[in-house]
């Protein structure tokens, strides 16, 4: 039975819009302001790659950022690699994607782990990380802090050989030397050398040894309760996949009628971006699309703050120690004034005395008036 009533939608009148404008403050646009300013300024990210030669570090970096940073690289022979000392090489490139600019710095460590005796071969690398902290601390403590250049290492991809049965002593030594200074993300290199069951066993072994030796690798932050289920699922997959088993390739091959980046073998094709073949996509999503900002935050709020607190503590301790010394400043004997100096001092004293008398007389006259 129809009631015969009609419902009319109420249109917003100019008066209603004015009331809404009065209630609207405007700070809801702050995220947009920050976004515009950040995009205009651009971003910077410093990534260190470490591991023995021949594990595909350069190829993986090229695959991650689609940028060739090693055009002029000279490949060394096995004998040259054995005699090579650890170097620190920086490659910087400006990348732009959809109007967003990224200044990417890759810190390479050729010569690491290639010598017969690798005792403390990570020392030049730890020194480099400390030098960047020190430079930033000096710039931050200076007068001109407007354009501080951030060269701190935000992440270190550490490549683990797939041919061993877990971590080697040099792997443990490197990660323990740097785990309090930089975010370490361990990777199993050249995962196409292993079958899936071998990869799972190697991952379990590496996780056990990381816990056994007390190594602190980068920990993914917990998801907020208001995150959507897709993001939570992606986060769970990232945590379960670590350490990532990766493959890199600069070659485009044809697979099932499509051109993909991968490697061609007699038994088939390994696709770099196929998640059934390796964890490259998970690593790229973590490093670039979801956790790049968190890596920078942890570097600034944890690793750099620890270094800064240590520096301030050392400075305070040194000042306290100096103040407790009996004679921190040597007391030099004062020179004996000669006759001319004594005469000059007497003249100055006489002049001061006359000025005081004049001031006293002027003050007395003002009181009498």
From Swiss-Prot:
GTP binds at residues 51-58, 85, 111, 190-198, 248, 263. The gene is Septin5. Residues 51-58 are annotated as: G1 motif. Residues 338-369 form a coiled coil. Residues 189-192 are annotated as: G4 motif. The modification Phosphoserine is found at residues 225, 327. The modification Omega-N-methylarginine is found at residue 168. Residues 108-111 are annotated as: G3 motif. It is found in: Cytoplasm; Cytoplasm, Cytoskeleton. The keyword Cell cycle applies. GO terms for cellular component: axon terminus; calyx of Held; cell cortex; cell division site; cleavage furrow; microtubule cytoskeleton; plasma membrane; presynapse. It comes from Rattus norvegicus. GO terms for biological process: adult behavior; cytoskeleton-dependent cytokinesis; positive regulation of exocytosis; protein localization; regulation of exocytosis; regulation of synaptic vesicle docking; social behavior. InterPro entries: G_SEPTIN_dom, P-loop_NTPase, Septin. Keywords: Cell cycle, Cell division, Coiled coil, Cytoplasm, Cytoskeleton, GTP-binding, Methylation, Nucleotide-binding, Phosphoprotein. One of its GO terms (molecular function) is GTPase activity. The modification Phosphothreonine is found at residues 13, 336. Septins polymerize into heterooligomeric protein complexes that form filaments, and can associate with cellular membranes, actin filaments and microtubules. GTPase activity is required for filament formation. Interacts with SEPTIN2 and SEPTIN5. In platelets, associated with a complex containing STX4. Interacts with PRKN; this interaction leads to SEPTIN5 ubiquitination and degradation. Interacts with DYRK1A. Interacts with STX1A; in the cerebellar cortex. Filament-forming cytoskeletal GTPase. May play a role in cytokinesis (Potential). May play a role in platelet secretion. Belongs to the TRAFAC class TrmE-Era-EngA-EngB-Septin-like GTPase superfamily. Septin GTPase family. This is Septin-5. Expressed in brain and testis and at lower level in heart, spleen, lung and kidney. Residues 41-314 form the Septin-type G domain. Phosphorylated by DYRK1A. It comes from the Eukaryota.
